[in-house]
Amino acid sequence: MISRIPRLLFENILVPVADVLTKSVSNFAGHKSDQSYNSNATRVSTISDEEIEFYLNLKSAVLLLCLALCIAGFSVLMYFLYVLVFVPYNRVKRLGSIGYQNHEEGHLSKKDIANLVRRRRKVGDDLPPVFPNGWFRLVDSQQLEPGQVKQVTALGEHFAVFRSKSGKASILDAYCPHMGGNLAVGGIVKNDCLECPFHGWRFDGDGKCVAIPYSEKIPTFAKTKSWPCREVNKAIFVWFHCDGKEPEWEIPDISEISTGKFTYKGRVEHHANTHIQDVPENGSDLAHLSHLHVPHAMSGANLSTQYSSWWNFAEHIFKAQCIGPADGEPHISLFYLTHYLHVFKRFKLLSLNLNVYQIGPGIVHLHFDSPFGKGVFVQTLTPVEPLHLVLTHNLHASWSIPVWLGRIFLYLEAIQVDRDVMIWNNKTFEPRPKLLKEDSLIAKYRRWYSQFYTENSPRLTLKSEDGNGW
């Protein structure tokens, strides 16, 4: 039966279409294939042999064109199916793409509005330090191939992140100590070292200069700063401490990822115009879950219209329980979250149980158990500069959650984060919020989070000549 399908398509679709197109083109060109009448109304054929040959050749050409278009369309369809089924999801929301739909300066571009909001936003003197101490993601593992170097700007620093030929990742200061050349722009990885594009000085992963092409002797001062680096859970992290202290704790390895039990399904990246503490503080703000995130994800991320969507027959219901700091690991905070979809206020569908681990100021592991299988969202937060951060969610899940289903998970999760970003992009950080007793977890969370600030942690200062700056 299946073998007959191409023949049936050819005979019942392509050939009739070719006939119609051929007649149309032939008539348009002045080659009439029908019969004409003489003065006595007697039908006389006027088709010559040349016209018959022209007609047949034209029909063959049109038939081949239709066949080529069908093959091209089928190829495009198969490509999109391949991407949907096998290619991990990758969605990036740049700064300015979310949360500025209803701004008073609606005639401006989103990029201009985003910059305008950043300049005009009320920033008080009590804003917490902008760069806490801890581990922060710079790139995902799959984004850095062996022998490749990338420039990453984060935490007020410029990093050269490179992977040696043997596969080891290292992080150096981007600027060469010799004459300030940028090691990550034009630099070349040679074996386990990074060569400066300016004069050819070569540095190993520890920052030591191991070769200078025009000097036989390498002076002891020929070295650059090497940053503590860890590659864990398919991402590369840097340790930042304002006082230059060595790492005080390590990032937990998720065994299901390292052993391959969970496979990579995709990622979502958001750029947000906010203070880094605003983002993880969401976990302790239970009241916002039952308001901001209740409308179904398909009702969209625009907060002014989501409640008017016809998708409101279904609602997201969240219940959370905060556990607090982990025993013996004060840098980790735990809480449990349950979710289900409430349809027509009667049926509970798609239940989801999450164990959430806040690890330092910039990492969150969200382990979930769903009707489709188990998995983990690895959330990372990295400040690019004061009040501008990158938020990523990488999904790793069991074989029972295929890539196409992972795409749906990530898409729905991204819409919920879009709603948060719309709030973050337009809010100010309130250092002394007016909290109710029902908001007590927020105060507890802020006390816990304060451990990642020290006396010398960088703060945002105000410059009258150009607005916000250092």
Swiss-Prot record:
Cofactor: [2Fe-2S] cluster
Coiled-coil portions: none
Cofactor comment text: Binds 1 [2Fe-2S] cluster per subunit.
Rieske domain residues: 136-238
Bilayer topology term: Single-pass membrane protein
Transmembrane portions of the chain: 67-87
Its biological purpose: Catalyzes the production of 7-dehydrocholesterol (7-DHC or cholesta-5,7-dien-3beta-ol) by inserting a double bond (desaturating) at the C7-C8 single bond of cholesterol. Essential regulator of steroid biosynthesis as this reaction is the first step in the synthesis of the steroid hormone Delta(7)-dafachronic acid.
Entries under InterPro entries matching the protein: Cholesterol_7-desaturase (IPR050584), KshA-like_C (IPR045605), Rieske_2Fe-2S (IPR017941), Rieske_2Fe-2S_sf (IPR036922)
Protein name from the UniProt record: Cholesterol 7-desaturase nvd 1
MF annotations from Gene Ontology: 2 iron, 2 sulfur cluster binding; cholesterol 7-desaturase (NAD(P)H) activity; metal ion binding; oxidoreductase activity
Pathway assigned in UniProt: Steroid hormone biosynthesis; dafachronic acid biosynthesis
Gene designation: nvd-Ci-1
Protein source organism: Ciona intestinalis
